[in-house]
């Protein structure tokens, strides 16, 4: 099972999301997701989320919380432990991302975007400020 992080930055009623539209063979192609990626050797979840967020956006997280762990099980893909974060502050200048298009999406438009069905479950828990949680999702 691989370990990854995923972070959703929320500011002024909008969310910074990544539209995965640049790679043809991307399992997330055309989905709107948070910012994150795979752990590097000897990284903690905090190390990974800060590095991935900085690499993909140019922004440095300054306020964030660890929300939960989502276990993905699939007959089609390698299993994954995704460490989920919610951020409320950062510093720096947003830059282009080679993984897709970064965009600020108003909360009111968020639900209408193409997303994984499982994402809707953990995003609801995250937005409700649920205590630390663990989910298992099968695709």
How should these model regions be labeled?
Residues 1-17, 38-39:
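Conserved N-terminal beta-strand and adjoining loop/helix that marks the start
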Residues 10-14, 23, 40, 89-93, ...:
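Short, charged/polar surface micro-motifs in flexible loops or helix N-caps
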Residues 15-51, 55:
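Conserved Nudix-box catalytic region and its N-terminal flanking loop in Nudix hydrolases
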Residues 39-62, 72-126:
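Unchanged
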Residues 125-139:
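Charged phosphate-binding loop/patch that engages nucleotide di/tri-phosphates or the phosphate backbone
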